[in-house]
From Swiss-Prot:
Keyword Transferase: yes
Residues annotated for [4Fe-4S] cluster binding in this entry: 112, 116, 119
Originating species: Leptothrix cholodnii (strain ATCC 51168 / LMG 8142 / SP-6) (Leptothrix discophora (strain SP-6))
The protein's name: Dual-specificity RNA methyltransferase RlmN
EC number: 2.1.1.192
Reported function: Specifically methylates position 2 of adenine 2503 in 23S rRNA and position 2 of adenine 37 in tRNAs. m2A2503 modification seems to play a crucial role in the proofreading step occurring at the peptidyl transferase center and thus would serve to optimize ribosomal fidelity.
Cystine bridges: 105-359
UniProt-annotated location(s): Cytoplasm
Additional note from the record: Reaction proceeds by a ping-pong mechanism involving intermediate methylation of a conserved cysteine residue.
Cellular compartments per GO CC: cytoplasm
Statement: the UniProt record of this protein carries the keyword NAD: no
Molecular-function GO term, any one: rRNA binding
Name of the top EC class for this enzyme: transferase
Length: 393
């Protein structure tokens, strides 16, 4: 019998599972805390659970972390982990400490079916959805391995001296890694519940962000089920260009997407939508296109004035993309047009340049290596550099 991975369960599902084992709900709360707040992967560590329950769980369940293929640390504090998810697939997770926050960027799929022109992951194609356990295992590993480092005197977390963010190893989670989260909704929703649960990671809805390329029906669904902060990969000011850069636009054009964003604000934890905009030299970075964006989200746009902010993202070049990063002066000029038009606009700082380039590139290299190995030797993925699994904090 295959052991049940308890990382797959939100608290309600874990309570139902405990009831199947003849246990009361409060046991699920204890177990949940041991897993997510204390990082325990061994039932024997759970000292406030009855020995009979620990023995029962050891027979039928497990807490199975992902195998770490490699860990890359940047001089700016950024950490990128590459996790093995089986069948020649790997996913990336990135930890980004800043002065006022410490953000974990996690993946929701192995590969991606959307196929955005500027995205390394999209060029790899889609392999499969991650399970809830595989999504949460990224957060679980990062939280508890870094917590152990802090206990050993290593400086991790937000660099701020005071405030709630400085007390947390991870203060923010963004689903902006590999994959389209809203095309894996069945696994993403329970993972979000665990992130927000006070018995889990206790993050506020404002500090958890789902980024989507524009799956309109699922934006509506998320608004009804669990509205967290929403970011939308926009990247173009009109349908003609967005059809090319973000092929999903052919199914859900801008007017529909902006309508869903407007409706989302009624229940969102923030009073604005974040639009992500990858700056591509000579493609979408002219002043004229910036002015078109102002019209798109302004009073005369398809849904009227849409409260939003823009995050301009420097393009990370990767082989065969055929695209170039906009120059710094062009990015600043583009941003100034938006700012002068009354939009809050930021330019994302590039982080971890000395450890990797585009999101998905490490995973793509693993895919390529694995395909060669399968043809030549039929051997499993080669471990680049193993990292120890975290102990309970």
């Amino acid at each position: 019998m295959t052991a049940v991975n308890l990382l797959d369960f939100d608290l309600d599902a874990l309570a139902a599972y405990c009831e199947q084992l003849g246990e009361k709900r409060f046991r699920a709360v204890q177990l949940f805390r041991w897993i997510h707040q204390r990082g325990a992967a061994d039932f024997g560590q759970m000292s406030d659970l009855a020995k009979s329950l620990r023995s029962k769980l050891a027979d039928v369940a497990c807490i199975a972390p992902l195998r770490v293929l490699s860990e890359h640390r940047s001089s700016d504090g950024t950490i990128k982990w590459l996790f093995d998810v089986g069948d020649g697939n790997a996913v990336e997770t990135v930890y980004i400490p800043e002065d006022d926050r410490a953000t974990l960027c996690i993946s929701s799929q192995a590969g991606c079916a959307v196929g955005c022109r500027f995205c390394s992951t999209g060029h790899q194609g889609f392999s499969r959805n991650l399970s809830t356990a595989e999504i949460l295992a990224q957060l679980w590993y990062a939280e508890h391995s870094l917590r152990r480092e802090r206990a050993e005197g290593v400086s991790v977390g937000a660099r701020a001296a005071t405030g709630p963010a400085s007390e947390r190893i991870i203060s923010n989670v963004v689903m902006m890694g590999m994959g389209e989260p809203l095309q894996n909704y069945a696994a993403v929703l329970p993972a979000l519940r665990v992130m927000l649960d006070d018995h889990g990671y206790g993050l506020s809805r404002r500090r958890v962000t789902v980024s989507t390329s524009g799956v309109v029906p699922m934006i509506d669904r998320l608004a009804a089920d669990l509205p967290v902060a929403l970011a939308v990969s926009l990247h173009a000011c009109d349908d003609a260009l967005r059809d090319v850069l973000v092929p999903l636009n052919r199914k859900y054009p801008l007017a529909e997407l902006l309508g869903a964003c407007q409706a989302y604000l009624a229940s969102a934890p923030r009073d604005f939508i974040t639009f992500e905009y990858c700056m591509l030299d000579g493609v979408n970075d002219s002043d004229e296109q910036a002015r078109a964006l102002l019209k798109l989200v302004g009073d005369k746009g398809p849904v009227g004035r849409l409260p939003c902010k823009f995050n301009l993202i420097p393009f990370n070049p990767f082989p065969e993309s055929g695209l170039k990063r906009s120059g710094n002066e062009r990015v600043q000029a583009f941003a100034q047009v938006l700012i002068d038009g009354g939009l809050v606009t930021t330019v994302r700082k590039t982080r971890g340049d000395d450890i990797d380039a585009a999101c998905g590139q490490l995973a793509g290299e693993v895919q390529d290596r694995t395909r060669v190995q399968e043809r030549m030797t039929r051997s499993p993925i080669r471990v680049i550099r193993s990292a120890a699994q975290p102990d309970a904090a």
